[in-house]
């Protein structure tokens, strides 16, 4: 997944140096997709002086769980704003709200990233990135198909398995260790 999409969608995670697995397929098969109207609207992430807005709405082409997103980064130094169109696919696995995301702009990315999400009692959207080491272990032990490449910071993981098998893996783990501990927190602005 390109840096531009990671920075825009997972601004806080990138600022913290987080890495996450990429997949050729979404986290769940389309039969598990759900429309989640609570995500519709405009959300804002403010982290370490960086401000990123995301406008989310359901896709007219494929409304079952597919959302179009436009991320806009407001630079802190007054330079030009950057934007990235993205696609989200929302689903439920073992009682958890999960999503797959990818860049759909000029530098379209064919791979997906994964997150777990929830709306807290304050109406904030909390997002937990998929844990790279958990998926690296799953590939190394044969629980999932994919490739693991070691790098100076840990591992790069690219899953090639089916959405059905990825969803089954997440379900059998009960979410434990599959997603990070520290959420990205977004405030709804509209």
Regions found by a protein language model. Name each.
Residues 20-38, 46-53, 57-190:
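Calycin-type beta-barrel ligand-binding domains and close structural analogs
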Residues 1-2, 20:
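N-terminal hydrophobic targeting signals that begin at the initiator methionine
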Residues 15-18:
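C-terminal motif of bacterial Sec signal peptides marking the signal peptidase cleavage site
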Residues 2-10:
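Sec-dependent signal peptide recognition
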Residues 11-12, 140:
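Terminal low-complexity, poorly structured segments
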